[in-house]
Amino acid sequence: MQEKSKPVDNLRADAEKIITRAIAAVLPDAAVERALKGKTFLGRVYLVAAGKAAWQMAHAARACLQDNFCGGVVVTKYGHVNGEIADVACFEGGHPVPDENSLRGTDAALALTEDLTESDTVVFLLSGGGSALFEKPLLPLAELQDVTNQLLAASADIVEINTIRKRLSAVKGGRFARHCAPAQVFAVVLSDILGDPLDMIASGPTYPDSSSCAQALDIAKRYGLRLSERAWALLAQETPKTLTNVETQITGSVRELCAAAAAACEALGYEPMILTDCLCCEACEAGSMLASIARTHARDGKNLAFLMGGETVVHLRGKGLGGRNQEIALSAALGIEGLSNALVFSVGSDGTDGPTDAAGGIADGETAQLMRQKGVDAVQSLNDNDAYHALGAVGGLIKTGATGTNVNDVTVLLLRTAE
């Protein structure tokens, strides 16, 4: 690989520091401890944690829950269990599509919380990814997997997907809280959806559902979903609209992630500007937009940082491998080619991006040229949704490993003056 210029070296070093500091600021340990500090539960206490950050949240919570603790269950993504937790059974399952292990972990949680009394409390820790990981389907698993894959392939957004999921599940849309009744549920939620809609985060197992049957049916028809008669009938059934046994506390969000990244940029000498913390568009469009901003401001003579937080979507056109953050980086690479002082990175706060081992992607003004030297057609790779292999060929993958948190993604454009 050709030797990189000093500005690019500096940009990549800065990017690594920004990623590390931003993710550290939204780790759930301290947030869970704050939520449980001073809380007193008089009866028996049970712990259920679901989502990509479930193990980390449960580990922190277990240290706080000593008196009357009667057991717990964690259901998280493969590779996200980091050890044993006393008196807590840990399960790993499929994401973004549920599998048999997702169901096995959820069954354990349901069994743990059966036949509770009014004096009992279920501490429920919820994070993104819970829609796939915490599941008791009202359809055969294979059929539910097919519906999920249809929605993902159609580029449905997370609210649309979860509106459908709620009606096909025995635990979503407030139904888990109803299962726990008459016990009290204290829910601590790590938000991964823009605007923090509690009924949509992991499909709201303990929160009243604000969506309607009419909306669910409209989504199914608009995307041309191929559904069985049973599935159509379930979409027409309403979910719980009121719950009286739940207290909810939200902690951690993409807004905090962006603020932490901006603070890290400022500490490194950049002038940061958060463009949005509600990014929701095609991933390749986000990359192109940042490239346009880079070309507009590349000669301003300042160290600038433009930040966006949220969750883009990928329209599946090919059969390649990648994720939305990698696709942002690949798209940006084409637009910033030749700019020696520009770099774009995009990373998922949970450490995973699509069905890959990467958290995201990074590209600078030399990335597209390096791809050509390696025999990689960047445009074709983008069309094939094959950002993983394209970026991997030139050292453009970001790999953090599982972080233990999940508050959407952060995307950053860095512009640095020559030194």
Model-found features: residue ranges?
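N-terminal amphipathic/basic leader segments beginning at the initiator methionine
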Residues: 1-44, 48, 56, 81, ...
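Short beta-strand segments
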Residues: 48-50, 73-76, 124-128, 187-193, ...
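A glycine- and small-aliphatic-rich helix-loop capping segment at beta-alpha/alpha-beta transitions
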Residues: 60-68, 87-90, 110-114, 137-150, ...
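Glycine-rich oxoanion-binding loops at beta->alpha junctions
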Residues: 75-119, 159-160, 164-165
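Internal gly/pro-rich beta-alpha loop/helix module
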Residues: 140-226, 235
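Accessory alpha-helical/coil subdomains and C-terminal extensions
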Residues: 183-186, 208-289, 293
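Active-site segments that bind and position negatively charged phosphate/pyrophosphate groups
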Residues: 269-346, 354-355
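Internal helix-turn-beta structural module
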Residues: 330-419
